[in-house]
Amino acid sequence: MEPKGTFEGKKILAVDDERDVLEVIAEQLEGAHLITASEFESARQVIESEPLDLVILDIMGVKGFDLLDLARARQLPAVMLTAHSVTARSFQRAIDKKAVSFLPKEELSRLDELILEIFQELSKGRTHWTKLAQRLGPTFKRLWGETWEQIKFPQDPNISW
């Protein structure tokens, strides 16, 4: 599958305190109207004022979970993206706070595929958690061992605002 160019008309905010990560996101999401922010305050302003199709939030460095709360208040679907917080605790917190997905930065080279998959699920009114578990479950199980089996996925995959 070659997903590039399938993001036409999508307005996406990407928030990360690492410029090189934002550059990779821009390359991966070619065709989208991409807005980037590298710190909390500018991201907050965009979330509170722009109509967005998706928000991609780093967890560390930019207060990603606080930004997730703001995005959810505006009924904006948000994906948590992280390198340093690839923990079962952060994963569960993302589910509990109603993010639509959680992506390790080690998957950045496949970000376009993953975001396309997320948009497909969103178009059906669903989160990406089930697809994510199918796609990256073995990776998370390798990282977290038995803890992976204890993750509490949403009972209803439909988006609830």
Task: Report each predicted region and the residues it spans.
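Phosphate-coordination loops involved in phosphoryl transfer and adenosine-cofactor binding
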Residues: 9
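Acidic di-acidic motifs
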Residues: 14-18
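A short, hydrophobic beta-strand element within the central beta-sheet of small alpha/beta folds
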Residues: 56, 60, 68-71, 75-89
